[in-house]
C-alpha cells in the first residue's frame, strides 16, 4: 500500500484529503506543522508528502529544506499545496526541491491524478 503524508494546519482540508486518499487506497499519515512532519519521518517513510507552506511553528519551505538535507528521504516526492499563488512562491517551492506546486483551491480529482503521476 502506498503511503501519503498530509501536512496542513487547516482541519477541513486535512479531513477532506484524508478521506479522498484513504478511499483511493492509500495509507495516510497526518501532520499539523513541519515539526510533526519531521517526527513522523523518524518512524514512517511515505511515498509522497502533501505539504502546506503556511503552517505554525515550522513552515513548509523550512520543512522541505530539512527533508532534502537527509539522504534517507531523497526518494520522497513532495507536492506543495498552498494558497500562495505568486510566481515567486511557486519558483521558491520548486527550487527547494518540490516535485509539484498546486495552488488552493484545487480539484481533488486532479490532485489524485498528480499524485499517481509522481508515484
Identify the residue ranges that each predicted region occupies:
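Acidic, metal-coordinating helix/loop segments flanking the phosphotransfer/catalytic sites
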Residues: 30-48
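Receiver (REC) domain active-site loop signature in two-component systems and cognate sites
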Residues: 55
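Charged docking surfaces used in two-component/phosphorelay signaling
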Residues: 15-23
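C-terminal output helix
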Residues: 106-115
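A Lys-centered signature of the CheY-like receiver
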Residues: 66, 104
